[in-house]
């Protein structure tokens, strides 16, 4: 049965308008995004199939076009729409950070970094450059590696910090494996970067490791 044939009070779009998005299930929210189902399935049914197939919203959002298109009714057009929504969300969070106030909230930074790095199939290392008032000057992905490794060069980060006239930095990288637990190499790198940046009076405020739904903070665990 098509959603248009459902009682009005049960339709996801009408429920969202009346009660707000927070009360809807993941499948209902996806159904609003999809708009239409396929033969024999409503948009909600198709959304449930998507969630069952990928296992989680995070896995769905991180899927490649080939993986996304495996389900009947999904293809390049829907994939492009989804990526556009995700990019708009990233940019919205980036705007919040640029205001400056959000940088005083580790949770806001974590959410932004999850969107920025969480879905990447390779290891990436990013740096947030901040001014003396902890306002974001720039966020740059400086290094990109393989599934399990990326090479980070302290001199390049020092160079960028000088270019941006940064007073402090926040370091971040992802683990495509899904684990946010830092490795021994991560700990060594953090200390090496901290020492290199201290030579130019730039503080390392935190180092976040993004792994799936979890984000590890070096500062919160007393490792800085």
Swiss-Prot record:
One Pfam family cited in the UniProt record for this chain: UPF0758_N
Record CDD domains: MPN_DUF2466
Source organism (scientific name): Janthinobacterium sp. (strain Marseille)
Protein name: UPF0758 protein mma_2551
Entry-linked InterPro entries: MPN (IPR037518), RadC_JAB (IPR025657), RuvA_2-like (IPR010994), UPF0758 (IPR001405), UPF0758_CS (IPR020891), UPF0758_N (IPR046778)
Annotated keywords: Hydrolase, Metal-binding, Metalloprotease, Protease, Zinc
GO terms (BP aspect): proteolysis
Disulfide bonds: none
Matching NCBIfam families: PRK00024.1, radc
Family label: Belongs to the UPF0758 family.
